[in-house]
Amino acid sequence: MRRRDFVKTMSAAGASVLLPHRTLLAQTAQSLLPEPRVKRVMVMFKCHFDAGFVDTQYNVVHKRYFEKFFPEAIEVARAANAGGKRRYVWTTGSWLLFEYLDQASPADRKTMEDAIARGDIAWHALPFTWQTEMMSPSTIEGSLALSQLLDKRFDKATTGAKMTDVPGHTRGIIPPLAKHGVTFLEVGVNGGSTPAELPPLFLWKNPAGASLAVMYHHEYGGVAVVPGSDLALVTEVRGDNSGPHRPEEIEKIHANLTARFPNAEITAASLSEMANALAPYHDKLPVVTQEIGDTWIYGCASDPLKVARYREISRLRDEWIKRGTLQVGDETDVQLLRHVLLEPEHTWGTDTKTWLDFDNYIPSDLARMLDTKNYKVVEFSWIEKRQDLMDGVATLPPSLRGEAENAIRALIVPAEEEIAGRPIPHPPGKPIETTYFTLGIDPRTGAIMRLRNKAVGREWASEKNSIALFTYQTLSANDYARYQASYLTTKADWAAKDFGKPNIERFGAKREEWQSVNASVEVTRLKRSHIASVALHFDDEQAAQSGRVALPLSIVIDLILPDDKPIIYLNLTWRGKPATRMPEALWLTFNPISEDEKGWTLDKSGEWISPFDVVANGNRHMHAVQKGFAYESGGHRFEVETLDTPVVALDKRDPLVFSNDQPDVKKGFHSCLFNNCWGTNYIMWYGEDVRARYILHA
């Protein structure tokens, strides 16, 4: 996220004015050739919303937007439009406006209602910017209820949407948006990140024929002339949580647009007005059918508990919808989602480079800092994000709330496991015979090295093609230099700090991987299942004592094989992991025997997508999956449902990869249990016990 990036520009009077960089895209128009054929220019104004970052989420929302920015925007728009022309309309996501109207005093609410009636304040269809790969189709649908309720209240029809900062999204968002009348999505990419190779305006289609017009550009805002028309669309987006434009900025923007489009009428507009103006020209737009993906998705593996809770409640909500207990967009759903939707919002805490130092990385140094003011603020901002989900659960009717609380409680890792039955030590190399499978465990790594489906004789694993291979990985300054050289589009100081970990070389950071050197296996025969418990053992005490490595004290993989169906429940549990700021990643690799690389697909927000169908400069290396990933060929199918850990790397087991090479899927699918490799506002250390659950269909 490009932060505190300000540049000086000259106002119309020649005075020096300090403005956020994102407002300046239209202001560069004077350096461009005039475009006299354009007769209509529609301009959308907003600032980028981070639910946190510069401060805690509460302070950003209430102290900045509710107490300061909304009143300022109302007055700025009133003054700008006083002459009878629409020169300024301030747009916000639906969530901020919905919350403001719900919480404001009667007088402030009336002032806002009057501004909306005048057309001075507008909202778009989405609550805010998400990392959309973290969302189910029904969650996306449910989120639209906020804008639909505002539409009903103010007699509007919202058809336009915007997301800013996150470089790309999944094709799975198209059907739920199109289903509810959203026809236009504007995407402004973070200025330090490589944008996907896409036209500035295109029609994004999925295989079923659903479509969405998209405006895409490498800045928060942009300018696009609609093909085959006299229309230009402009989005003017101020910097992060920076509020409405100043009057002198508005004048400068209009002046520059007039210079670029001398024959055009320039009008401030909402995104829905822009969407409706663009609609007649959809058939003139280039068509894109590929996945784009999110090159920031590796950050979403930084808080395993938050993500596990969110995914559990999302699945439970889908079950309630299926049962008819809850309907998408009803009052119960809205009250739940107005909190839960903040979980996949793209801001996960406060700005690490502002609040933290670059000296206290190793576990012993970090432990000494955790009680200091800035570190406590950062940790609070992460806890605040987790609390959003709990606040949503608290709004549920008692019966649903009880279900949700029980589901969340079940995610707590107990200090010790309750042992069912009588575990019997089992030689790791010796096959384990169950009703449906012959199972073999690697005596060193503890991974599955044999998995034979007895009914069809299909062998899925071998010593070369193992399943559920655990790896602990550390990274180096060279890894960050390589990654930044391939991905960043700027050498600005903020980018190196956001996308790096300055000074880690001083603390001995190395790129290394650790796998178990000795696995012990116990098998328990229960009435209706077998349980194979695999304990992993590591041998590098020197690395741990140096602070370079923060391996858990205990890692156990439980394989539960029921007698009534050919599936395996796989639970990986770690306990006693030291918290560290040194870059680390924990992985579970699935690399079954496969013959046809084209047989692999990933479920992303409800659409099964080929890993080879991703646009250039999209994310071809890493995805967040909804249900899981699967291989199918020759009438046989191997599927991994990943209940808690959605982020999956393909080919290289590495969170810091940006490449246009197609992935070599024969090197495996690596489920990221946790990483702290990205800075910005993600979780930087994690010392809690973790359980990651999977279901294998073979």
PLM feature spans:
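Catalytic-domain carbohydrate-binding cleft regions of carbohydrate-active enzymes
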Residues: 12-13, 29-388, 526-698
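Small/flexible residues
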Residues: 4-5, 24, 311, 508, ...
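Short amphipathic alpha-helical segments that mediate assembly, nucleic-acid/protein binding
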Residues: 25, 250, 401-404
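N-terminal export signals
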Residues: 5-26
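Catalytic and substrate-binding regions of extracellular carbohydrate-active enzymes
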Residues: 330, 334, 342-574, 690
